[in-house]
UniProtKB/Swiss-Prot annotation:
InterPro entries: PSII_PsbK, PSII_PsbK_sf. One of its GO terms (cellular component) is chloroplast thylakoid membrane. Keywords: Chloroplast, Membrane, Photosynthesis, Photosystem II, Plastid, Reaction center, Thylakoid, Transmembrane, Transmembrane helix. The chain crosses the membrane at residues 14-34. It is a single-pass membrane protein. This is Photosystem II reaction center protein K. Residues 1-6 form a propeptide. PSII is composed of 1 copy each of membrane proteins PsbA, PsbB, PsbC, PsbD, PsbE, PsbF, PsbH, PsbI, PsbJ, PsbK, PsbL, PsbM, PsbT, PsbX, PsbY, PsbZ, Psb30/Ycf12, at least 3 peripheral proteins of the oxygen-evolving complex and a large number of cofactors. It forms dimeric complexes. One of the components of the core complex of photosystem II (PSII). PSII is a light-driven water:plastoquinone oxidoreductase that uses light energy to abstract electrons from H(2)O, generating O(2) and a proton gradient subsequently used for ATP formation. It consists of a core antenna complex that captures photons, and an electron transfer chain that converts photonic excitation into a charge separation. GO terms for biological process: photosynthesis. Belongs to the PsbK family. It is found in: Plastid, Chloroplast thylakoid membrane.
Length: 43
């Protein structure tokens, strides 16, 4: 991933932290859904 970012123009270097966070978002949604179902009681 870092090689890909290094090849991009300098204007995209601002979005590098966002690209690093992107893979974590589905995991956060899964955890949020799990906690929500646990609070509801797995109905």
């Amino acid at each position: 991933m870092n090689m890909l970012i290094a090849q991009l123009p300098e204007t995209y270097s601002i979005f590098a932290p966002v690209i690093d966070i992107l893979p974590v978002i589905p995991i956060l949604f899964f955890l949020l859904a799990f906690v929500w179902q646990a609070s509801v009681g797995f109905r």
